[in-house]
Amino acid sequence: MSANELPSSAQAFQEQFLGGFVSRKLLLHNPFDHNTQRAFAVAPSPLITHENNLSGNVMMLLSILICGIICCLGLHYIIRCALRRSTRFMISEPVPSLSSTRGSSNKGIKKKALRMFPVVSYSPEMNLPGLDEECVICLSDFVSGEQLRLLPKCNHGFHVRCIDKWLQQHLTCPKCRNCLVETCQKILGDFSQADSVTAEPTEIVIVTIVPLEPTEIVIVTIAPLEPTEIVIVMIAPLEPEGRVNTIREIS
């Protein structure tokens, strides 16, 4: 055997060995192997992962929105209760210097005109134009039987204490801002006319009864005339017992 044939045979053996090894390796990595199929089945696809992330974000946003709405409603209720309590406290609290303040500023409506505004007893069946179910001053609902004062022109109704307190410092309706100056001037003008009519001087007749003074009563006694008799008549004032002294002198 020559030296040239040895390398060729060795090279052929090496090629056969490598070819068998590669084919055996390919058989081990068969694409139809159960383990390989299971690995492909378990691996999640990118589309499914994206959909899961999107649904999770939507649920989180909805949860945050619902929690925010609940917190806003609770905060609104707390603020409303606090304002209602503070308003009722201010109404029930006496104002010591109210007369002096009104005298100096003269902003509110006089009590004489305020008392002429109509007062009604509230009932849910009432159907008055402009009358609501809530007092906008104290933010509390009207209860059946409560006394409400109605303002002229706009016919808006409020609690008597609330609107009296308001109109002591303002001249307008707290809801529609309707000015009440003309109405008050008309009411006060009618009052002034009524006062002038009642203030006219009247004639007063005074009858004084004075007791009568005692008067003198004259009693004359006539006796038959005799020659020797002289009749003397004396006039004396009336005594308390009504006795009359008659003196007859016989000469």
UniProtKB/Swiss-Prot annotation:
Membrane topology: Single-pass membrane protein
InterPro entries assigned to the protein according to its UniProt record, in alphabetical order: ATL10/ATL72-79-like, Znf_RING, Znf_RING/FYVE/PHD
Pathway: Protein modification; protein ubiquitination
Annotated compartments: Membrane
Broad class of the protein's primary localization: membrane
Organism superkingdom: Eukaryota
Entry keyword set: Membrane, Metal-binding, Transferase, Transmembrane, Transmembrane helix, Ubl conjugation pathway, Zinc, Zinc-finger
Reactions this protein catalyses: S-ubiquitinyl-[E2 ubiquitin-conjugating enzyme]-L-cysteine + [acceptor protein]-L-lysine = [E2 ubiquitin-conjugating enzyme]-L-cysteine + N(6)-ubiquitinyl-[acceptor protein]-L-lysine
Positions of RING-type zinc fingers: 135-177
UniProt xrefs under Gene3D superfamilies: Zinc/RING finger domain, C3HC4 (zinc finger) (3.30.40.10)
Family the entry assigns: Belongs to the RING-type zinc finger family. ATL subfamily.
Free-text comment on this protein's domains from its UniProt entry: The RING-type zinc finger domain mediates binding to an E2 ubiquitin-conjugating enzyme.
Protein name: RING-H2 finger protein ATL10
